[in-house]
């Protein structure tokens, strides 16, 4: 793959405030839609097909299958779409031959030859997808005089810088801690949950500031941060627990004021950063307190509530948006767990992403962040054996990159829906077709339609009295770009 790297559009904070639907005139008369398709049982992977032409259309009958798009009514503005730049991804990247390293960077970060990632997450200190546990200070150093990110300078920082360069010099980057240093915790352990000791709340708030300032001095701008990764999970890896009230109070009494005092008040602070199941309860506890809410840009969430046997709980996102329309929702992590190399071609991987992304955006989400952008042939490295899938797997034994269909499913959004795009009204009249649409800053409208059923489905793409006839293949996703 070859490409020219184009700059990622920088967004002013003011453009990201969620709003009620706004009315902007739009007509599809005389327009065409370029079609890009990924379909099971075919060689189509983001494959361009014949353009569709729009013609005047009468009132559709109930027997006609339609995807209705109304670009005149717009909603939230897209911050970006991307994935996490972890120790595991960086170490795996370093093992690849130079040619495959460049292929990887183009594949993710070029908006022309790749899928144009514009959003990224990384971790403060170690996480499960590190080769070992570590912190940035010596044991007992609450003053942080020994603070150093020397560990990250071997793999992760150079990796992030190469990703930034491939994205045109800028990525919207947010950071998340998995655990405070062990001496700051009730269980004196980086792993296995535990809580932040009250006497170290200020030292821990200072730690975030020190990390952000250090990374920025090294040339990595930080856009925002989450309070804590997965605050309700006692994990066998790095973890730390907060009740909703503890998180609220830490934000308003320590983290928020400390960021402000450290001249980092412009960094976007994200609360929760865990599953959709408790999303409303956690968000409302923080946002109903003005002293805490003043520091909070948005609420982050993951998709792992399915561990209970539940389906994904998209209505909980909608509940937050209904109650707190001026807060932002951001998907901060998701991956398919229980890695097996012989399953990298399974179609379920991509369909999980497509289902989540369509419903998350339709619920008001402004940014969507996958977990590891790259893992090796074991689904790691991971120092506690929590091996998972990534959209791209590197077989470090051969140097070959393996593209799962999740990469292409994500690309149907990230390549064609760019930062600054506004979501527009979209509905379907059959539940086996899912769809979302955005109007890009250049005026083009991108409509993503997913068919997770076993049969192809003819339908009309219907836009304000103009329609184009097309077919959605079985187990497929397609993006229609209206010029």
Which residues does each PLM region occupy?
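Conserved, mostly hydrophobic/aromatic
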Residues: 83, 116, 173, 225, ...
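C-terminal beta-strand-rich structural cap/linker in extracellular carbohydrate-active enzymes
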Residues: 471-483
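Carbohydrate-binding surface patches
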Residues: 415, 426-464, 475
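Bacterial Sec-dependent N-terminal signal peptides
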Residues: 1-28
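Active-site neighborhood of glycoside hydrolase catalytic domains
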Residues: 203-224, 231-337
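Alpha-helical scaffolding within the catalytic cores
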Residues: 60-70, 157-159, 210, 253-254, ...
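N-terminal catalytic cores of secreted or lumenal carbohydrate-active enzymes
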Residues: 46-222, 243, 253
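Aromatic/acidic polysaccharide-binding cleft in carbohydrate-active enzymes
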Residues: 328-409, 425-428
